[in-house]
Structure formats: C-alpha cells, structure tokens
C-alpha cells in the first residue's frame, strides 16, 4: 500500500513539474507583463471572476497600463489606458472580432457555428442586424415598441384600475415583466392563434428565459449546459416556441425576424431547431441587457428628486410641443425618432445609469503575430491571443468622472443643457469616454433601439403613473458581479416601489 501511494505521489509530482516546465507560458522580449496564475488552465480566472474591477486595478498598479493574464486557457492582453483605446481599434486588420462571439453563441445556444467561414450558412449576421435595427427599419421598431408598451401599461377600457390604490411591486420584477413582454411582441409579433392565451404564453417564456439566463455566465465560461438540467429544458422550450412553423402564425413580426427566417431557409444548412436557436440568440440579445438597464434608469431617476423633476419637465414639454395629450382612455402617446433623440435630460439619466452599472468586456482575437503600437509603447502579440478592453475601469475613473460612484443625472449635460461630449484624462481629450455598448466593429448594432426602448418606458412611467420608492428602499442595491463581462449588471436584490395611475 505504501509503495502504491509513493508511486502515485511521484507521478503527481512529475506531472506538476512537467506543467511548470512545459505548461507555463514564458514572457518573450517585447511582450506585456504576464500573470499565469497558480491553477493549470484556469490561470487567474477565479480572481478575475470574484471582482474583475479590483483584479484589473491591482494588476494595473503592479504592471502598468498593459498586461497579460491567463484566463480559462486563453491569454488575454488587457489595455487599461483609455487614451490608447483608439490606437487599439486602429489595428483592426490584425483582429478577428467574430471568432470568440460565434464560438460563444454556438456553445451557449446549442446551434452549429453561424460563421460563414465554417460553411453552415452564408448569411453575414452583423449586416442583417445593421440593416434591420438601424436607419429606416428603426422607425417601425420604435413605433411598434411604443404601441406594445402602452398596450401593457395602460388599463383596459373596461377596467376600474384607473382609480385603484397604490400597487407595491419589486421594481426589477416590474421592469422585467413589462420590458420582456413589450420587447417580445415587438421583435416576434403577436400570435394570431392564441389571442386569449398570448399573455400567459409570453409569461411562460419569460420564466424559461430567466432560468436559461441565470446560467448564461457559466455557459460563456465553458461549462456544458447539460450540467444545468432546468436551464437546458428552458432553453429547448424557448427554441421550440421560435420554430419557423410557430413564427409563421404570428402577425407584425419585425423586419429583423422576417429577414432572418428567409435567410435561414435559403442560405443555411441548419435544421428547424437550429434555426429556432439562432432566433433565441436575438431574443437573448434584445432582453438580457436592456432589462437591467431599464431598471437602473428608473431606479436612479426616482431616488434622485432633481433628476425626477428635470425629467418630468422635459417629458411634459416634449409632449406638449408634439401635440400629444396624455390620457388613459384616449389616443396612445406617439413620438417620432427625432423627438426621442431630442431628450437630453433623459439621455443623460440613462447614460449615467449605464456608466454605473455596465461591466462589458470588449474583446478581439489576434489573427496573426503582430506588434500593437500604443500611446505608451509597443507590444508583441501572439496569434490567437485576445486583446481586451474593460470600460468599467474608465467609467469609474475619478480623473475622468469626479466622484465616480455618485449618480449625477446631469453629468452628460453641458452648461447649455445639451448633450456633453467632452471628457478628459491626464489633460487630454478622450475619443472614447462612454462604452457600455462596445466599440468599433464589435459595437452593439441594436444600441439605438435599446436606448429608444428605455426612453419610451421612462416617458410612459412619468406620464401615466405616480411613482414612489417604499420607505427604506432608496439605498442603491449592490451589482450582481457574477455577470461581469456580459454587459449591464443587474441588482443583487430587488427594490420595492409603489405606483398608481395619475388622475388625468
């Protein structure tokens, strides 16, 4: 027994030595400082996952503005000086920004690769998104969202809820319920065969979405979904509801989904379920960050009396100028894109809310060995390494944003009450100072629609409802750090508020 134990001990020690000799990457001349971490494969992943912001700040103090960390078997070069961001983006010819995103999508949603290079489809999905989420297509999306929000938020004609007392509800739950239903109807249309049960069907999809989204960080980290039976079942049910045979029964489907259905049928070799799972990608992308962003915008506005007053006055003035009468029974509110774009106070409130809650990771994969030339030096990068920007470092930098942890509703307003676009670091004007939606080729193609959605929601909340936080609920809830790197962090706990219809 002792001999066997000794042999196993020697074998394990030998493996550890081999790993130390062969498995640890050595920093080469001209490369950034390197942190391999102590755990094989994981590297620094546990420290990064526990608190990305503090982990990166600590390495920034130790190594400077550029350093490399091993995370889940990948070598990630973090660029932390915001003055260098534009220089990084100038090296676009060396980057493959699609590789990581396509691989993550296939892993999380369960379809084959949607990268045209892999031969399963010839659709350029980014072009599809730009074509159907921006320009003229944005008009119909915006109009549909406003209509659906009011269908959900305004009382039915025969209802007595117009005179009801205060309703108390969790604010995050409220935002989740309203924005999910309105967004679902806007993107995927209304079911012609389920008029009576449509709301129940959407709420069932909402529950499945929550179950799936709960494990999404683990899926991105590389864990197989079969480890999470409930989430796997929820994902498959969501996909079933998005099969083409089901979508064809719906009316007022967005141009995005109509075009994607056509391109899936004509340009791909996906089976019916895989096609549905590519639509599930759209559902997740349209909801997962918009919902928490809506919550933070509403919460920060309500808890700040000055913000509430300024926003209410701006909305009232805009509606009057547009000739819109606010009524629970009359015509619904309708604002054009131009009118939505001319709301600097709401825009600043949303930007400030996202600045405080966004934790996105902007990444690109090196297609070949190359030299990265930045403001503070040049660095050799190896093929298949990852270049990463973590904008939360910039968003919470006191030199760029004084008193960075405090919500200031007018932070993005200039002295004339217009949108402020000038921010400085080390006395130099920043080209990139606000990046919750990514940057360059990886910038979110649906960002304009997302901002419109949140503005529309806030306009309707201010127009139709009296709003108050429950006593003792004004303290800002902590951010859920488990989703760091994925976008907008939701609150770790919900906040109770109360609302009732105004006497209009």
Swiss-Prot record:
Q: What are the UniProt keywords, alphabetically?
A: Cholesterol metabolism, Endoplasmic reticulum, Heme, Iron, Lipid metabolism, Membrane, Metal-binding, Microsome, Monooxygenase, Oxidoreductase, Steroid metabolism, Sterol metabolism, Transmembrane, Transmembrane helix
Name the residues that bind heme: 444
- Reaction it catalyzes: cholesterol + reduced [NADPH--hemoprotein reductase] + O2 = 7alpha-hydroxycholesterol + oxidized [NADPH--hemoprotein reductase] + H2O + H(+); 4beta-hydroxycholesterol + reduced [NADPH--hemoprotein reductase] + O2 = 4beta,7alpha-dihydroxycholesterol + oxidized [NADPH--hemoprotein reductase] + H2O + H(+); lathosterol + reduced [NADPH--hemoprotein reductase] + O2 = 7alpha,8alpha-epoxy-5alpha-cholestan-3beta-ol + oxidized [NADPH--hemoprotein reductase] + H2O + H(+); lathosterol + reduced [NADPH--hemoprotein reductase] + O2 = 5alpha-cholestan-7-oxo-3beta-ol + oxidized [NADPH--hemoprotein reductase] + H2O + H(+)
Gene Ontology terms describing biological process: bile acid and bile salt transport; bile acid biosynthetic process; cellular response to cholesterol; cellular response to glucose stimulus; cholesterol catabolic process; cholesterol homeostasis; negative regulation of collagen biosynthetic process; negative regulation of fatty acid biosynthetic process
Pathway membership of this protein? Lipid metabolism; bile acid biosynthesis; Steroid metabolism; cholesterol degradation
Q: How does it sit in the membrane?
A: Single-pass membrane protein
Q: What Gene Ontology terms describe where this protein resides (cellular component)? A: endoplasmic reticulum membrane; intracellular membrane-bounded organelle
Which compartments does it reside in? Endoplasmic reticulum membrane; Microsome membrane
Annotated PROSITE patterns: CYTOCHROME_P450
User: Membrane-spanning regions, if any?
Assistant: 4-24
Q: Could you tell me what induces this protein?
A: Up-regulated by glucose and by cholestyramine. Down-regulated by chenodeoxycholic acid.
Q: What class of enzyme is it?
A: oxidoreductase
Record's InterPro entries? Cholesterol_7a_monooxygenase (IPR030681), CYP450_sterol_14alpha_dmase (IPR050529), Cyt_P450 (IPR001128), Cyt_P450_CS (IPR017972), Cyt_P450_CYP7A1-type (IPR024204), Cyt_P450_E_grp-IV (IPR002403), Cyt_P450_sf (IPR036396)
Q: What is its EC number?
A: 1.14.14.26, 1.14.14.23
Cofactor(s) named in the record: heme
Give the matching PANTHER family: CYTOCHROME P450 7A1 (PTHR24304:SF1), CYTOCHROME P450 FAMILY 7 (PTHR24304)
Function, as annotated, reads: A cytochrome P450 monooxygenase involved in the metabolism of endogenous cholesterol and its oxygenated derivatives (oxysterols). Mechanistically, uses molecular oxygen inserting one oxygen atom into a substrate, and reducing the second into a water molecule, with two electrons provided by NADPH via cytochrome P450 reductase (CPR; NADPH-ferrihemoprotein reductase). Functions as a critical regulatory enzyme of bile acid biosynthesis and cholesterol homeostasis.
The UniProt family comment states: Belongs to the cytochrome P450 family.
Q: What is this protein called?
A: Cytochrome P450 7A1
User: Organism source for this protein?
Assistant: Homo sapiens
